[in-house]
Amino acid sequence: LSEKRWVLLIASEVGRTDSVSDRAMERLVDAIGEEGYEVVRTTSPEDGLSLVTSDPSYSTILLDWDLEGESQFEERAALDIIRGVRHRNKKVPIFLIADRTLVSELPLEVIKQVHEYIHLFGDTPEFIASRLDTAVERYHEQLLPPYFRELLKYNDQSAYSWDAPGHMGGVAFLKHPVGQEFHRFFGENLLRSDLGISSAPLGSWLDHIGPPGDSERNAARIFGADWTFYVLGGSSTSNQIVGHGVIAQDDIVLADANCHKSICHSLTVTGARPVYFKPTRNGYGMIGLVPLKRFSPKNVQKLIAKSPFSKDARSQEPTYAVVTNSTYDGLCYNVDQVVEQLAKSVPRVHFDEAWYAYAKFHPIYKHRYAMGVPDDMPDRPAIFSVQSTHKMLAAFSMGSMVHIKLSDRAPLDFDQFNEAFMMHGTTSPFYPLIASLDVAAAMMDEPAGPTLMDETIGDAISFRQAMASIAHRLRVESANGEAWFFGIYQPERVTDPATGESILFEDAEDELLMTTPTCWTLHPGEDWHGYQDEDIDGDYCMLDPAKVTILCPGVNAQGIIADWGIPGAVLTEFLDSRHVEIARTGDYTVLVLFSVGTSKGK
């Protein structure tokens, strides 16, 4: 916030005439400049809409509704700009400039969305500029989330520290040429923000007091949880916190055999008696979901009876279950169905959603994420979601969250659970990392979060369709129809539920693909996914649009080996030589991820 703030002025052509309105506008621009703002002008609605959707750093918007000019634009265009702003930011002040239009004549939608109505001749330019400055100051006070706001405020006070860390706000680095390079690279703000735990205004992360607690409660609201804990060791640590917080020695627990090693560690340390659900696998080697029938009480009891670990357990009734959602290749459970089944056997269900922190923020994932399980589900267990916030959202690496949806069926004492949290914590947390979790959560709040996810999924769909289109055109244009290109793990055709029409994936409308989960559902009787019909019945399994698996020639979904192929490692090596880093390499697959940080240039 130390950089100069700027105001976006979207108005019909000014500065080229000598009209009274033109001169009044120029005087207002000068007065705003005297308040310390830069005024960025655009004269067309197209440019204005482009700016408000591409650069969110403006502090306020001045929007011309009916100002005279050579290319005055329609009221409808101004309304589109207002909608474009509010689609991303519901707090930034919008000042509507109108010479002739009375407030009573404005559409109600406009009246609800604008901050103030400016008549250029009603007050002096200096007074209007002062009103604008007041609105901007109020906006910036409310803009920042709790922890980052206090960290910024503390740093601005330039307090002397006689506490750890020893670099003392980066000063130590300035005493050595190597340290100076380090300081130059990371910058003073980051180093000054690396503070000791004795900085009282910043509260206590371990005790959830002050700004850290305020931030966690804000994140809980945003993500739909009752409690949220910020974890600074990644989801590997978060998984262990959950396990250590709820599992007792010799408890029987139900675990996805595809679970992360951190869950195995938590089971080992707690002395749990694990009984494993076996997931599926297709011909590409992709690990799929655990079929729904394997979560049934009958199958659970069968697994417990067969397991040597169940002998001498405290009870033959399991106390906890853990499931990986989504899989590493982007296959998502119908979580509501999973919980409905597991609720018949366990009072606690833990979903490892390390790569899936964004699911709440787009309707295509409805029923498919942990914190979305209905509160009124009969006998609902306590639900735990572990997310690597840094993986797919905008937190620093190692930033993670534990979200908890409480249940009377399995009461959880906050202080007792916090002991497990503190066991994996530190009295020397990295404050910028906490701030990044605070900011990552705030960015996903409405309306910006859903908009970011809409854009992310739109980019992923564009990439998918482009790849499918290239492959299709190469086959059509080749002499023998045998030309090849890399494939994408997705259906070749989708069905519009409104019309029943079957459409090539690359020809489908964006709106259809972005709003219709059945376009991404794995259906029985289709060859492209490679899973058995009985394991994916109904809408149980859905492919995540944001996780894109590129298929190399050499094997198909049924595991049939071709005469020739290109292993995934070869493609990865090629891309690496072009400075393109991908997420994961399989035998004949390469995974790329679309997140809120993906650029269209990629």
Locations of the language-model features?
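Two-component/phosphorelay signaling modules centered on CheY-like receiver
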Residues: S12-R41
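Conserved N-terminal alpha-helix of the aminotransferase class I/II PLP-enzyme fold
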Residues: E188-T237
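Conserved PLP-binding active-site segment in aminotransferase class I/II-type PLP enzymes
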Residues: G122-H208
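Conserved C-terminal alpha-helix-loop-beta "cap" of PLP-dependent enzymes
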Residues: I457-K602
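Output/docking surface of receiver
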Residues: R41-T43, E74, A98-V103, P107-T134
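Conserved phosphotransfer microenvironments
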Residues: V20-E26, P45, S57-K91, D99-E105
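Conserved PLP-enzyme active-site core in the AAT-like
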Residues: T42-P45, L51-S54, E68, P107, ...
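Short, flexible/disordered intra-domain loops and linkers
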Residues: V14-R23, E68-A77, Y284-R294, P363-R368, ...
